[in-house]
Regions:
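Class I S-adenosyl-L-methionine-dependent methyltransferase catalytic core
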Residues: 1-267
Length: 267
């Protein structure tokens, strides 16, 4: 957004596997619907996810609520306009649009149709399904086959995956703004906080401004949306500067080559 403030303007954004009552992705885009100039926000939930087992106000207050389907079917939520007349489009305007025919798996026909409708896909997919495995299409390939823009979380190890690396090599996708040396921290539920504080601080969690935040060290962003960090100049040292101030290198060159200059090779 800092690089291109209009990146989401007039766009339909799909958040698959993101229940709006529990997903910070949905909350974030709902809160910034007007600022980003979104056309439509679509969120789906997966029936077998932990958050899906809890009823949301959006679902309970809807005439479409069905207790049996709640436990077995994925759900569809949409946000398009100021439904409550508050003068602003926000999370209170999210509409429960009904149950999916299946469990909400991203590979299903109905979620794939939502993918095709969307301009941009953003989510935190199951890391175990990031790439194709055992003949089942992976999440990244599912997006790329539709030629969609995306921002998704994944494990750093996916960089070396035979299905992922070629896309990085061809500059078709790239890593997000976060440096690989930086950890990610997430807001977590109260129950999860209690579980975390039994672990060692720094390994599983970190207290930031008095709040217990879950830590994820091995995650990074994958995207094909341009961002400013890709255009920042690399600060590279010069050979002359390195020879002048690198005492260890000077000592090695003098010992092995009898002079303090870089050796030249003809190969």
């Amino acid at each position: 957004v800092e690089y291109n403030p209009d990146v989401f303007r007039d766009k339909t954004v799909l958040l698959p596997c993101d229940d709006p009552e529990w997903s910070n992705f949905t909350k974030y885009f709902a809160a910034n619907f007007n600022r980003f100039g979104l056309k439509k926000l679509i969120s789906t939930s997966y029936a077998k996810s932990a958050g899906n087992q809890q009823l949301t106000l959006f679902e309970m207050e809807s005439p479409l609520f069905d207790q049996e389907k709640h436990e077995t079917h994925g759900k569809l939520f949409t946000l398009t306009c100021d439904r409550d007349g508050s003068g602003s489009v926000d999370a209170d305007d999210i509409e429960f649009s009904g149950y999916l025919d299946g469990d909400g798996d991203f590979r299903s026909v109905e979620v794939t149709a939502l993918r095709d409708e969307a301009d941009i896909i953003i989510t935190n997919p199951p890391f175990s399904q990031f790439s194709t495995s055992k003949g089942r299409m992976g999440f990244l390939q599912w997006i790329l086959e539709a030629n969609k823009k995306f921002v998704i979380l994944g494990n750093m190890n996916a960089i070396n995956d035979k299905e992922v690396f070629p896309h990085l090599e061809r500059n078709e996708i790239w890593l997000g703004y976060k440096s690989l040396s930086q950890d990610m921290y997430f807001h977590v539920t109260d129950d999860y906080k209690q579980w975390l504080i039994e672990k060692k601080e720094g390994s599983a969690y970190k207290i930031i401004d008095g709040v217990v935040m879950g830590r994820l060290a091995s995650a990074c962003w994958f995207t094909n949306i341009d961002h400013g960090k890709r255009h920042e100049p690399l600060l590279l040292d010069t050979m002359a500067h390195n020879l002048k101030y690198n005492k260890k290198l000077r000592k090695k060159l003098e010992k092995e080559y009898g002079k303090i200059e870089y050796p030249r090779y003809d190969n």
